[in-house]
A protein has these predicted regions:
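Bacterial Sec-dependent N-terminal signal peptides
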Residues: 1-35
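Intrinsically disordered, low-complexity segments enriched in Ser/Pro/Gly/Ala and basic residues
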Residues: 6-9, 248, 711
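Compositionally biased, intrinsically disordered low-complexity segments enriched
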Residues: 6-8, 19, 212, 313, ...
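Intrinsically disordered, low-complexity peptide-like regions
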Residues: 12, 25, 34, 409, ...
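Beta-propeller folds
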Residues: 17, 30-486, 490-505, 509-510, ...
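Small side chains
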Residues: 20-21, 28, 253, 552, ...
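Generic structural signal for short, solvent-exposed loop/turn connectors between secondary structure elements
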Residues: 21-26, 183-184, 295-298, 389, ...
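Serine-hydrolase catalytic core recognition
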Residues: 59, 264, 338-339, 347, ...
Length: 809
């Protein structure tokens, strides 16, 4: 062999080695990556609940003052506090060590302060607490009830109190009697019989009187008219009456619904009993005939044993929606022995909202109970759909605080009760979410709103004060946080729960002037951080139009190495009622933080059409294009992040979602088959022509056609089965087999289309599970983790029969 031949062989060998080295360094082909099952196992839902305790406060306001009490749990146990906003003090309710010793003496079973299982804690008369303790071994447990005097710290045992009124009774505001439904008709009991029924519904001394006789199955009164119970069951069981009361307890209003033309839908529970069980329920799909509602006002007789009924003409639109408006509950209402449900109004009349089936027309009406007349007070008209909030009455009912998106943003308007517009209370390019409270004496309202601070994430909610005379908004809480506030009845104080997706949750107490009275709590995440937890990172990108800002969060593996390259998975929900993107911190991160630990970058990001808390243009962007509207934005967001971060491998892109996100993730891998390589789609409404009418028609639109006086509704929409033949990547479809929200037929139709297109795919049916997957969520997680580990990471335990991580949990 000549020297020249040796040189040629050597050159070729070096060339091959150089090419191999380049390939090994190339993104997506690169270094061998191992899926980190152990790190994902460390943050199971069960284990996170052992590391994360209280993150928010629910203030329980006193009945006759601005004080409130709350509980707060940490790794050191649960503590209970009373806060006096006027004095600016916070006092522990119990000396927990002393209380544990006292309880131990009473029940003869040992307890210590950190593990004292206080249940059913209730404040009575602003002076004492009652609670119960379960003691003993598993097979020999007792419940002991206690009364604790706040002023003296005295502890006594008391008889166990049951609910004084059954929950199925709609009790009159005066508490003297209650109305309920049975056998599609309305009945009444006095308070004596109601209390007996709360203890034992079979008590033979209970007296009930029938109020109606015209109700029949599927055309009757109360909740039982819509339930899936058999006819025999519905004549025996008690159901809520679904009614609203006049403040003087003399009248109530209710709707009688005719649902006979609504078709049935079914699921079969294959694991319920010895025989599979058929569940039937009424389910209206888009374009199908709707129920007819009839408004009735009942006047109780003096003996409260009967009532006269009058039908009120309220029809304005075919297949209209009708909602009887309820007065807002106060802190004092929480101390009643029953759930108070007064109508919004006074003894002479009440308010109702009626809306056309296409939701483009809405009327706020007042019903006069003496003349049975219905008067339109405020009308809203849109070319997409109208949304609303319950009105707020002030000035003894003479004025109305009305929420509207008529100018493209959600603002508050002040009306007189005759429908005359007085003024705009807020007017700007921001979103008012709700009225938190009103102080008429001092002339202001407290409200929650977002998008006011233009240098912040527009989803971050804040608390504002605005004069009833109109004027600029005054922000009362902290900047650059997402704030969830609860106000006292007089709106003089509010409790602010605040956090960000990258900030530890905390709680502060404010006055209505903006004074920060006290920092109450900060969540203890120490155990979580000790386990290796790290906050996600916030980011901002552009939508596919290059103009609209989109906001998201990036979740990295906790052992992230910036020198490595990772696949990326997009956790999606298209909206339009909410986006998958977390704004505040939450412990529910199985599909984001935890999924990333397998060895991926996981992101959540909004898309045009995804959320109502921005402009109405943004919210309604997907109207008429419900399948595809958010897909381009999601793809473009990922591409921007890939260009921004060298550790993201755009050749290994996954997508995942549940419900609407299941629908969206499948649509994405079918619309962009060369971009998305793997999708796990759960409980998806893949064919919105068979999803529920309300959601599908509202967010996509329905055509109202009037021909020779006859009104019909036509619905047409693009579906995932129509594009199943586009599949190139790896798709796993998951559904609970008794999902009565998004029927399994949605997934089966995609399966049918894939089979007929000769496509390989994966499918997981979860037996006996409804829309949320119930006790099979952990099993589902590992099947999802296996799928992405195999197709995006290249290292999976998918083919092992045992999920050992679940056995260790």
């Amino acid at each position: 062999m000549t020297e020249q031949t040796y040189s040629l062989i050597f050159m070729r060998k070096n060339f091959v080695l150089a090419c191999a080295a380049l390939l090994l360094c190339a993104p997506g082909f690169a270094q061998t990556q191992k899926a980190n099952y152990a790190l994902a196992e460390r943050f199971s839902a069960k284990r996170v609940n052992q590391m994360v305790f209280s993150t928010q406060i629910t203030p329980n306001w006193f009945r006759d003052s601005d004080k409130f009490w709350y509980s707060w749990r940490t790794p050191q146990g649960t503590r209970y506090y009373i806060v006096d906003p006027v004095k600016g003090t916070r006092t522990e309710v119990f000396d927990m060590d002393r209380l544990a010793m006292q309880v131990t003496e009473f029940v003869r079973y040992p307890f210590e302060a950190k593990h004292l299982p206080i249940r059913d804690l209730r404040l009575k008369d602003d002076k004492e607490f009652t609670f119960s303790i379960i003691s003993g071994l598993k097979n020999d447990r007792d419940t002991t009830c206690f009364r604790y005097e706040i002023a003296t710290a005295r502890l006594d045992t008391v008889a166990r109190e049951k609910d004084k009124y059954p929950r199925w009774a709609s009790v009159a505001p005066n508490g003297e009697f209650g109305v309920f439904a049975k056998g599609s008709n309305l009945w009444v009991m006095d308070s004596t019989s109601l209390r007996k029924a709360a203890k034992d519904e079979k008590d033979s001394t209970i007296v009930e009187h029938r109020l109606t006789t015209d109700g029949i199955r599927q055309f009757g009164y109360g909740y039982g008219n819509y339930s899936g119970d058999t006819e025999a069951d519905s004549t025996k069981r008690h159901y809520p009456g679904e009614l609203v009361w006049s403040p003087d307890s003399k009248r109530f209003a209710t709707m009688k619904w005719d649902t006979r033309k609504l078709d049935d839908l079914w699921v079969i529970n294959s694991v319920s009993d010895k025989r599979p069980k058929l569940e039937s329920y009424k389910y209206q799909m888009p374009g199908e005939p709707g129920p007819k509602g009839y408004l009735y006002i009942f006047t109780m007789n003096d003996g409260r044993t009967g009532a006269s009924a009058r039908q009120v003409k309220s029809q304005a639109f075919k297949d209209q929606e009708v909602s009887l408006q309820s007065a807002r509950r106060t802190a004092k209402d929480n101390y009643l022995d029953y759930w108070k449900n007064e109508w919004l109004g006074d003894n002479t009349g009440f308010y109702m909202v009626r809306q056309s089936r296409d939701l483009k027309r809405l009327d706020l009406c007042r019903v006069d109970v003496d003349s049975d007349s219905t008067k339109t007070i405020i009308s809203e008209r849109e070319r997409t759909y109208v949304e609303y909030r319950t009105p707020f009455l002030i000035g003894g009912g003479k004025q109305i605080l009305h929420w509207s998106e008529r100018n493209g943003w959600a603002n508050i308007y002040l009306y007189n009760s005759d429908g005359t517009l007085v003024r705009n209370l807020t007017e700007g390019a921001f979103h008012v979410e709700d009225i938190l409270g009103v102080n008429e004496k001092e002339g202001y309202i407290l409200l929650s709103a977002c998008g006011v601070n233009k240098d912040e994430n527009p989803y971050q909610m804040h608390t504002f004060r605005v004069p009833l005379t109109g004027g600029a908004l005054q922000q009362l809480d902290m900047n650059d946080m997402d704030v969830l506030s609860t106000a006292s009845d007089d709106a003089k104080f509010f409790v602010a729960n605040y956090s960000r997706v990258d900030w530890t949750p905390a709680v502060a107490l404010f006055s209505a002037t903006g004074k920060r009275i006290a920092d109450l709590e900060t969540a203890d995440l120490s155990l979580l951080f000790e386990a290796g937890y790290k906050f996600p990172e916030r980011f901002k990108v552009k939508a596919a139009d290059g103009v609209t800002d989109l906001y998201g969060a990036m979740y990295k593996p906790y052992d992230f190495d910036s020198t490595k390259v990772y696949p990326i998975c997009d956790y999606v929900y298209p909206g339009p009622q909410v986006e998958a993107n977390n704004i505040s911190w939450s412990r529910g991160f199985t599909r984001t933080d935890r999924l990333a630990q397998i060895g991926m970058i996981v992101i959540t990001v909004g898309n045009r059409g995804g959320h109502p808390n921005r402009s109405k243009w943004y919210h309604n962007y997907g109207y008429g294009n419900l399948r595809d509207y958010g897909l381009e934005d999601q793809k473009y967001a990922i591409q921007q992040l890939g260009a921004r971060h060298p550790f993201i491998d755009l050749d290994r892109v996954g997508i995942h979602g549940h419900s609407g996100g299941g629908f969206m993730s499948t649509a994405a891998i079918l619309k962009y088959p060369d971009f998305f390589k793997a999708a796990v789609s759960c409980a998806g409404n893949h064919d919105n022509s068979i999803y529920n009418r309300w959601w599908s028609e509202q967010h996509h639109g329905v055509l109202e056609k009037i021909d020779k006086g006859d009104t019909t509704f036509v619905y047409s929409i693009q579906t995932n089965p129509e594009i199943a033949s586009n599949l190139k990547g790896h798709l796993m479809l998951v559904h609970g087999d008794i999902d009565n929200n998004v029927h399994p037929a949605n997934t089966i139709r995609v399966v049918n289309a894939l089979i007929r297109a000769n496509k390989r795919f994966d499918m997981l049916i979860l037996p006996g599970q409804r829309h949320g997957f119930g006790d099979m969520n952990e099993y589902f997680f590992w099947r999802m983790a296996d799928y992405y580990a195999e197709w995006l990471i290249g290292d999976s335990e998918r083919w092992k029969p045992d999920i050992t991580q679940m056995n260790n949990d």
